[in-house]
Amino acid sequence: MKKLLLSLFFFFFFISAATAQTQLEMNEKASLDYKKADGELNKTYKKLVSLLDKNEKVLLIQAQKDWIKYRDSHCKFEADPYTGGSIKPLILLTCLEEITKERTKHLKESLKNLNQ
């Protein structure tokens, strides 16, 4: 997973480098990218919840709470080796964005399966 995150970091670093010139700018862009991914997740989650029966809602709500704990803990773990460095927020935010996008894909699959 570390290799994947480092690969993603360097990929996004070089893409971001065209517009962001400083570490602060890269961190700000990563924050905006994560917020965008989180917004898409919340939109998909709300749509899915609205279509579920009471029992399914309870199960999804608990699953989402558990997933949030996992996401936050995992990304803190991935960013920890960079403690004290200005790159740490970028590593953390990139991890949050990628895991959030993956969760959104899973929720969209559930939504698609529900609509079939």
Set out the residue ranges of the language-model regions.
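N-terminal alpha-helical modules
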Residues: 4, 18-116
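Sec-dependent N-terminal signal peptides
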Residues: 4-15
